[in-house]
Amino acid sequence: CGADWMGFICYHRSPRYVESVPHFMPQRAMRVGVFVNAGREEILQKAEQMGLNMLQLHGNESPQLCRQLTDDGYAVIKAFSIKTPDDVKRTTDYEGTCRYFLFDTPCPGYGGSGKCFDWDILSEYKGDTPFLLSGGLKPTSLPALAAFSHPKWAGIDLNSGFETAPAQKDADALKSFIEQFKNLPL
């Protein structure tokens, strides 16, 4: 479908949880494991088993764990729920420990709210770590994405906005959206 990275939910409580990488996995796509409050050993074991390239951490993981996983050879993406400018400031302790930050919509539980947060808050982000924009992105989000600008914005994370049911992605909608997004003058 044209995605550069493909995420696999490694959080047992999620309806999107996967035990292993599908056999039809495109070879060029980076494999991203999504974890919530897992310990280092569990993450490393799953990363080895699934052949992961990147680790996305969506819980209350410490900067120390992010640093350890980076030192273990993985690109780490640390997610932050953004509601206020103070939420953006929480990234400070993680500077230098992650390849990317991911800014998402706060919701009960972890992930998949289908709602956007106020992207204007990200004008408060002055860090050096590039970030991914997430939370409520769907096919109708293209005009808002075209209007968004930030010097550290590196990409987007898509999930529930492209599902026909939990864990069932609409491949045609994803492909169309990704093609259009890649052609935006960002």
Named regions from a protein language model:
Residues 1-186:
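Conserved N-terminal beta1-alpha1 strand-loop-helix module at the mouth
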